[in-house]
Amino acid sequence: MFRPATRILLRAPGVAARGPVSRRLISTAPPDAKSRSWKSTIVRLGLAAGAVYYYNTSSVFAEQPSLSFLSKQSTPDSSDETQLPTIDSIKPRIREERQAESKAVSQPDAQPTQHEALSASEAALKSPQELEDEAGQEAAFNPETGEINWDCPCLGGMAHGPCGEEFKAAFSCFVYSTEEPKGMDCIDKFKGMQECFRRYPDVYGAELEDDDEADAAAATAAGVSEPSEQPASPTVSAPTAEIDASSDSEGKEGRAKDVHAQVKSEVAEKAEQAESDDLVPKAWHDTEGTKAQQTEK
């Protein structure tokens, strides 16, 4: 019933029977596994390529994570590189700022005096002819180009009004006149301009008032003055020479208007003086009357 152990050991085979061993590579599938089709291979390659593309282009992986050991290790290095300012490095900067403030306080007092000295010296060096040329350049007429700026504010916009053509003719005639005294050949054009002004009193009321005042002053001066043996030679002042070069543009525009009004009054006075020379003086009538009474007696 019980078999001895020695008998069992003798009956058991010493070496187990082994089948033939087949060799294969890691990449090759085992013989018991089914071979995959080419479609599954393409799908796997596509998924791998998509994962790589998403990893390279997505912003999720581009952001630095909030919890990172690399960021904690880099912060001590950056803090060591930055150096805090010391007292020795601040002292030179404080000295430079104080010196700059002291220079800024002293310079404004010296600059106005230098500017005033330069302006005074420039005004003293300029001759009356240079002052006249400068005034002409800033006024309506430019002697260098020989052109008239009809849009100049000093003309008061009269060149573009209803009498603009008459004003342009009279003003250009006076500017380009070569007669002595200047403007004697432009009397008729100035009279035509004044007649045009009288046709539009609403527009040229101020100019008409100036002309009336100039005519009244000329009439009173002609009535009071006695005729002399030699006719007085008319002189035309050069008002543009009186313009100060240091005045601003507004002052020069106002002076240009005064010059224009003065020229008109002088032309009117010359015309009335030429007419008064042909008239018989009042003293001659008185002497003739006394002579006639004496002859009758």
Curated annotation (Swiss-Prot):
GN (gene name): mia40
Pfam families noted in UniProt: CHCH
Segments forming domain CHCH: 160-204
A molecular function (GO) term: protein-disulfide reductase activity
Residues exposed to the Mitochondrial intermembrane side: 63-297
Protein's GO biological process: protein import into mitochondrial intermembrane space
Domain of life the protein comes from: Eukaryota
Subunit structure as annotated in this protein's UniProt entry: Monomer.
Functional note: Required for the import and folding of small cysteine-containing proteins (small Tim) in the mitochondrial intermembrane space (IMS). Forms a redox cycle with ERV1 that involves a disulfide relay system. Precursor proteins to be imported into the IMS are translocated in their reduced form into the mitochondria. The oxidized form of MIA40 forms a transient intermolecular disulfide bridge with the reduced precursor protein, resulting in oxidation of the precursor protein that now contains an intramolecular disulfide bond and is able to undergo folding in the IMS.
Chief location: mitochondrion
ATP-binding is among the record's keywords: no
Ranges of biased composition (kind: Low complexity): 116-125
Mitochondrial matrix side: 26-44
Subcellular location: Mitochondrion inner membrane
Protein name listed in UniProt: Mitochondrial intermembrane space import and assembly protein 40
Species this protein is from: Aspergillus fumigatus (strain ATCC MYA-4609 / CBS 101355 / FGSC A1100 / Af293) (Neosartorya fumigata)
Keyword set, alphabetical order: Disulfide bond, Membrane, Mitochondrion, Mitochondrion inner membrane, Oxidoreductase, Protein transport, Redox-active center, Signal-anchor, Transit peptide, Translocation, Transmembrane, Transmembrane helix, Transport
Co-factor requirement: Cu(2+); Zn(2+)
Compositional bias (Basic and acidic residues): 90-101, 249-297
Cofactor-binding details, from the entry: Cu(2+) or Zn(2+).
Transit peptide: 1-25
Gene Ontology cellular component list: mitochondrial inner membrane; mitochondrial intermembrane space
Disulfide pattern: 152-154, 163-196, 173-186
Positions of short motif Cx9C motif 2: 186-196
Comp. bias regions, Polar residues: 70-86, 104-114, 227-238
Transmembrane portions of the chain: 45-62
Topology with respect to the bilayer: Single-pass type II membrane protein
Region (Disordered): 70-137, 208-297
